[in-house]
Amino acid sequence: MRHRRKGRVLGRSPAHRKALMRNLSSALFLTERDASLDENAPKVPGRIITTLEKAKEVRPLVEKCITLAKRALPALEEAKKYETSAERGSDEYKKWRKSEQWTQWADARAPYVNAQRRVLQLIGDREAVAVLFDTIAERFTDRPGGYTRIMRLAKPRLGDGGTRAILELVGKNDRVTRSAQRPAFEQDAPESDSAPEAEAKTEEETASAN
């Protein structure tokens, strides 16, 4: 019995399973890179199709990487206060490199670099890490969590009939819900205008009765 054993085996050894999770998460992040630089660009950025079990297993890793990247963005903004606009290799850049301002820049940027290294240890792809920190993380700055969604596909996989699913990043391919417009009705006449008419009718009725 597999009591107290977390996760799915997926029919693989631990090393093979770890490599699978790293490749799936990197593949999801790389779908957001510049399509003009990719010969095999995805049809829909921010989306991969895999089996339902693999999607559920890799989802926590993707969420963790996005959280690390998102929390490191304030350190990058703080470091911009101390950076220089001089060209690398110029005399002005060399002077800045030896100044106290560079030390402040390096100290402010240290949490950002540390987060990049941690994510690189998790997924092992430098290009995917660059896409995550440069493109994807800014999209979720105001979102407290839940950066991905899993949608089950109706058509199973050919060969073994495995259940397929879409794992995608939220916020870009969301459906736009349209609410129906409220019907406009003619406004009823004000009570002050209808009151004199009602009094006139009652006077006519009493006069005719007499």
From Swiss-Prot:
UniProt keyword Ribonucleoprotein present: yes
Keyword Hydrolase annotated: no
Assigned keywords, A-Z: Ribonucleoprotein, Ribosomal protein
Annotated disulfide bonds: none
One example of a Gene Ontology biological process annotation: translation
GO cellular component entries: cytosolic large ribosomal subunit
Segments of this protein annotated with the region Disordered: 177-210
Gene Ontology MF terms: structural constituent of ribosome
InterPro entries: Ribosomal_bL17, Ribosomal_bL17_sf
Subunit (UniProt): Part of the 50S ribosomal subunit. Contacts protein L32.
Family, as annotated: Belongs to the bacterial ribosomal protein bL17 family.
Protein name: Large ribosomal subunit protein bL17
Organism: Rhodopirellula baltica (strain DSM 10527 / NCIMB 13988 / SH1)
Gene name for this UniProt entry: rplQ
